[in-house]
Amino acid sequence: MELLGKSREELREWLKGLGEPAYRGDQIYRALYQERNFDLARMTTLPGELRERLGREATITLPTARQRYFSKDGSVRYLFGLPAGEQKGMMKPASVEAVFMPSEARQTICISTQAGCAVDCQFCMTAQLGLIRNLTAGEIVAQILLPLEEHKEELRPQTNVVLMGQGEPLLNFENVMAAMRIVLDPKGVGLAPKHVTLSTSGIVPGIEKLAKEPVRPKLAISLNASCDEQRDLLMPINKKYPLKELLAACKKFPTGSREYITFEYVLLGGVNDTAEDARRVARLMSGLGRVKVNLIPWNPGSLPYKEPTEEAIAEFHRILLEKDVPAFTRYSRGRDVMAACGQLALAEKGPQSSVIGIQ
């Protein structure tokens, strides 16, 4: 029985099945997710006899930090190795990336939800990997727990988590939500929903499904284009879920009184960064309610795109504000340590394939 990734209810039921009191499941749940204790022998709230039995019948499988890359901006990028295992058939071994980003008042952890990705966004390094496999709930939660434990002596009061690493979270919906229920449970990892953000390329059925979850992370949309023609080229998923459908789903998505839907827009020099693009984005945002736009200048890598000029960034930002669209310019952390999602896994995999750029 693999314990990491199991809910409190699952642990309680399993312990009852072993003939133990259900509250032993609560103790294991607390040890895993609040105390970050991954050694059954050190779970001293459990009787010694039970610990010995669990040592024979249970496992706690953690990703292996194959590499750590330390950026001059203080962020740490992890390349985690995931072992093969059994879950509805054989799971392939894989590598995924997570980033720990400290700031003055908080730390933000960016995590992956799939190894590789099938969505095939043309500007994304992860697309070159293809989809290797979905991550389990335990593998997703571990990307939060391990950096928190490693940096426990210097943690700030607030932890933010963004599901913006490798993979499309809404194409691994059940495992992602199983992980999020643990992360957002006050008796689990204990993060507030307002501090956790799920980013999607625009999987409309997944957005509609997420909207029905009683406790859920905030929603972010990876927009990156100002019209369907442009988005079809940059993000082929748009051919299946065009902007009209995507924005309609966003309009219906429930948000709290202080909650925004975030639209992320990667600025690609000479591709989607013109003043007319900015005006079109402002029109797309009209009537959607509480939204904000994060402008993300392209992070240089091996793909055939270039950074936007500072003038283009400033003009795009200015036009959005002029049109009453809340907008922020966000520069990638860890740019000096292969910070684009997928770069580390690709480097480990070997030579990179060529990708057709948008001309």
Locate the predicted segments by residue.
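Generic beta-strand structural signal
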Residues: 76, 96, 107-111, 119, ...
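Auxiliary Fe-S-binding modules of radical SAM enzymes
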Residues: 1-96, 251-259, 265-359
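Short polar/acidic secondary-structure junctions
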Residues: 70, 83-85, 101-103, 152, ...
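Conserved AdoMet/S-adenosylmethionine-binding subsite of the radical SAM
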Residues: 148-328
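Short linear Ser/Thr-Pro motifs
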Residues: 70-71, 112-113, 199, 222
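Canonical Radical SAM [4Fe-4S] cluster-binding loop centered on the CxxxCxxC motif
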Residues: 102-146
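Residue-level structural signal for beta-strand termini and adjacent loop
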Residues: 100-101, 175
